[in-house]
Amino acid sequence: MTRFALTIEYDGRPYMGWQRQAHGPSVQQAIEEAIHRFTAEEVQVLSAGRTDAGVHAIAMRAHVDIEKPLTPFKLTEALNAQLRPAPIAVIGCEVVPDDWHARFACIGRSYEYRIVNRRAPLTWDKGLAWQVARPLDVDAMHEAAQQLIGLHDFTTFRSAHCQSQSPVKTLDRLTVSRHGEEVIIEAAARSFLHHQVRSMVGSLALVGHGKWSARDLKAALEAADRQALGLNAPPDGLYFVGAVYP
């Protein structure tokens, strides 16, 4: 039995999320079934993060135990062949110790959120970014975002269905920058609550539109009440971009 660490890229549009679902296709299911087709083994692929329906990944980390003798190269080639034409690709693979765990060994996770700030509808980026027609004040968004850095009760910014035992998290980084018509929000923390990044992005968009001030954002945070949330951004623009390990 060999434990492999995988780095996976995927387009989340066709899936109900990473985790297996009873009511629709998932990324986890697609990968596990692809492995079964060339190993005849029932495996479980465990990830560093569990993205929601429609959320994408640039470099999701996961691990899987396989009995069949395989090198990382052969596993990558076979898995990518079996995954076609699904929008999922293994872009990295290595052998790791038997006690290495993609989720529990992870000490940092990062996400990126893409906004296309223009009036024209999206064509190539439809489902891959959030189109915001009204101009956004990125400087105001970035300045307001810094109030969310640090240890806080993020109840306002978590889903009512969040299963985390505590709403208290430490947000290490939250930046907002403009690149032409694209506005990129980057967030990093040891872990995030369900819908936390999307909720922060939606609220920052209100700041960018001038509907909220930085003070309003801080008041929403301090309210520790989901009803105080201004806006939850759609999943389209959210990407899991990396996991950090010791």
Swiss-Prot record:
The gene is truA. Coiled coil: none annotated. NCBIfam families: hisT_truA. CDD domains: PseudoU_synth_EcTruA. Pfam families: PseudoU_synth_1 (PF01416). One of its GO terms (biological process) is tRNA pseudouridine synthesis. HAMAP family: TruA. Keywords: Isomerase, tRNA processing. Its EC number is 5.4.99.12. Substrate binds at Y111. InterPro entries: PsdUridine_synth_cat_dom_sf, PsdUridine_synth_TruA, PsdUridine_synth_TruA_a/b_dom, PsdUridine_synth_TruA_C, TruA/RsuA/RluB/E/F_N. Formation of pseudouridine at positions 38, 39 and 40 in the anticodon stem and loop of transfer RNAs. Belongs to the tRNA pseudouridine synthase TruA family. It is an enzyme of class 5 (isomerase). GO terms for molecular function: RNA binding; tRNA pseudouridine(38-40) synthase activity. It catalyses: uridine(38/39/40) in tRNA = pseudouridine(38/39/40) in tRNA. Homodimer. It comes from Sphingopyxis alaskensis (strain DSM 13593 / LMG 18877 / RB2256) (Sphingomonas alaskensis). The active site is at D52 (nucleophile). The keyword Isomerase applies. The keyword Isomerase applies. This is tRNA pseudouridine synthase A.
